[in-house]
């Protein structure tokens, strides 16, 4: 999911100032139609349709006069509508934690702009500890060291399939030791001040500073996945500044801040539904559309037989890993836990299920040459890309390594100290595996906080309900959830929207498979989102939408139906589809 280059803040500052002319000394350029912005924007060197800037904020908001600062890197796709139709800025967070906002705008900023008729400046930023925002957490002084450590985690992986007993505990002990080696590197080498000040509350306060610097009187926000936690935190501490807020793919913010292991449990409630959808849609599509829908002896699969077939592949790889002599990512092996990891990530994007089915058939046949880069690249970002001297291309057009590293200071720093034992960690893996067919993969993330030493300077621990003191927001938040999302279940969206109350929240539910509404496009959902952002129309709580047919497995019939849509609706669905199939990692 993440990519290849880690560049320190000092190096970036020098390169940017000398090579691309983005420096804090630049003359202020205000947003068109406003003369109150105090952010200096200039054309980005990599994607000329976007503008970039640095913006300084206090390192520690509990001690703002300490003199230490964080340099936030921002990027925006300017509004294209006539000046009298513009609505200000729409801030986007792609999730994570640790998602690069600058990469998001560079990659899909124009698509988001099209969704809102060009009436907003589409803006985002690299949160603390992420990409070009500095100073870096600096746990590792080279990309190689971090990549090597991630490779070790990859090869050890979650204990799957479970074998039980001392062998399983020993496996988890080794995995935890590898994860702890990263934590130790942060203790020995890292920027401790930054590691303690990269939490969600600090980023929410950065957003407030950015809004003020833009000269705007409140926040318009679109947050995906972890972005729902960031948005909900902002709404909880600055309810008067919420102008428009869509939280799509809703995570349980209370569990996130209270108990990282419970947050993991809450996240996999609907993973079984997503996996069942992968199986059932394949069977329904048939062999002509889904390569897994036919057996080796040319018989039609059933849901039960296909499920057993995939279980058999896991067992085979668990007993004897597949050896890869060469591939784009080099030689290696594919183990059961590697397959499960990629399967989990592919549950996010139902538009890619037909490709996944083809890959699995090839893997069954003992050919993992083309599949192995997915093990290294999709999950750990180690697929090599052509070298370029342009630092922006190296940092923003691929997903940066320090973004992967930022998961720990954000996720682990936001939660209380995790003192789970090795045996407790092993038990947690087994528990999560029973909750979900791929629960071990989220256990690997949540349990990875074991032994993390740095707590965020500020953490928000509530209230999370009106009854306990949560204040009314200036404008209602729109929560959006698919009913079969593998990582942010519908139950979390119901809990969060109920917590903010009927005066401050409304929930839109969409039938569909994948992570966030972009994963399974719906014209109904899109119409409601546009009405909310463009006209201030809040959908009735509990509004239910269905996806457009033919997204997962297109047919001539569904193509014919789509051709009957208006030019505008076809264009909007096409844009959402591009976001859903983009390389931007939306979510955790």
Regions inferred by a protein language model and the residue ranges of each:
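Gly/Pro-rich cap/lid or specificity-loop segments adjacent to the active site
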Residues: 28-339, 409-588
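Short edge-strand/loop segments of extracellular domains
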Residues: 96, 363-366
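Fungal secretory targeting signals
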Residues: 1-27, 247
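P-loop NTPase catalytic cores that bind/hydrolyze ATP
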Residues: 332-362
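Second-shell loop/turn segments in exported
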Residues: 193-194, 342-345, 398
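Amphipathic alpha-helical substructures
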Residues: 365-382
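Extended, H/D-rich, highly charged conserved domains that either
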Residues: 380-389, 393, 397-405
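Glycine-rich, aromatic-lined ligand/substrate-binding cores of catalytic
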Residues: 352-355, 366-370, 403, 415
């Amino acid at each position: 999911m993440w990519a290849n280059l880690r560049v320190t803040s000092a190096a970036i500052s020098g390169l940017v100032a000398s090579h691309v002319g983005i420096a804090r000394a630049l003359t202020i350029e205000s947003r068109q139609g406003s003369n109150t912005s105090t952010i200096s924007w200039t054309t980005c060197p990599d994607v000329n349709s976007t503008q970039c800037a640095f913006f300084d904020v206090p390192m520690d908001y509990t001690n703002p006069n300490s003199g230490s600062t964080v340099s936030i890197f921002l990027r925006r796709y300017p509004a294209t509508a006539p000046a009298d139709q513009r609505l200000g800025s729409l801030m986007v967070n792609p999730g994570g934690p640790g998602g690069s906002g600058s990469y998001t705008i560079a990659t899909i900023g124009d698509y988001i702009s099209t969704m809102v008729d060009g009436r907003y400046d589409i803006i985002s930023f690299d949160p603390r500890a992420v990409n070009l925002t500095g100073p870096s957490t600096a746990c590792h002084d080279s990309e190689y060291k971090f990549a090597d450590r991630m490779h070790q985690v990859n090869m050890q992986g979650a204990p799957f399939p479970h074998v039980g007993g001392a062998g399983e505990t020993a496996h988890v002990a080794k995995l935890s030791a590898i994860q702890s080696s990263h934590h130790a590197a942060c203790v020995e080498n890292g920027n401790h001040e930054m590691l303690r000040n990269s939490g969600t509350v600090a980023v929410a306060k950065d957003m407030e500073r950015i809004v003020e610097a833009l000269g705007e009187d409140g926040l318009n926000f679109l947050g995906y996945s972890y972005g729902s936690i960031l948005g909900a935190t902002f709404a909880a501490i600055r309810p008067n500044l919420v102008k428009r807020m869509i939280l799509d793919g809703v995570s349980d913010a209370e569990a996130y801040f209270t108990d990282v292991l419970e947050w993991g449990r809450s996240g996999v409630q609907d993973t079984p539904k997503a996996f069942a959808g992968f199986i059932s849609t394949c069977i329904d599509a048939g062999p002509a559309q889904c390569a897994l829908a036919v057996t080796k002896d040319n018989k039609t699969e059933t849901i039960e037989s296909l499920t057993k077939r995939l279980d058999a592949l896991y067992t085979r790889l668990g007993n004897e890993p597949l050896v890869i002599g060469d591939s784009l990512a080099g030689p290696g092996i594919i183990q059961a836990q590697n397959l499960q990891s990629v399967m989990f990530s592919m549950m996010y994007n139902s538009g890619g299920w037909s490709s996944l089915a083809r890959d699995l058939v090839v893997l069954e046949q003992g050919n993992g040459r083309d599949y192995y880069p997915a093990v290294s690249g999709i999950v750990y970002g180690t697929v090599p890309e052509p070298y370029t001297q342009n630092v922006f291309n190296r940092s923003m057009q691929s997903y940066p390594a320090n973004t992967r590293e930022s998961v720990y200071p954000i996720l682990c720093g936001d939660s209380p100290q995790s003192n789970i034992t090795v045996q407790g960690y092993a038990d947690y893996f087994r528990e999560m595996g029973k909750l979900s067919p791929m629960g071990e993969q989220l256990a690997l993330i949540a349990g990875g906080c074991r032994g993390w030493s740095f707590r965020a300077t500020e953490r928000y621990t509530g209230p999370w309900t009106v009854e306990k003191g949560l204040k009314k927001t200036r404008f209602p938040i729109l929560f959006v959830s698919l009913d079969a999302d593998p990582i942010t279940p519908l139950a979390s969206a119901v809990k969060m929207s109920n917590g903010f109350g009927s005066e401050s929240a409304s929930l839109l539910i969409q039938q569909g498979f994948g992570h966030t509404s972009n994963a399974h496009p719906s014209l109904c959902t899109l119409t409601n989102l546009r009405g909310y952002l463009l006209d201030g129309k809040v959908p009735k709580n509990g509004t239910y939408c269905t996806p457009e047919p033919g997204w997962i497995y297109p047919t001539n019939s569904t193509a014919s139906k789509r051709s009957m849509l208006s030019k505008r609706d076809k264009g909007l669905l096409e844009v959402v589809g591009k976001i859903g199939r983009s390389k931007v990692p939306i979510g955790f």
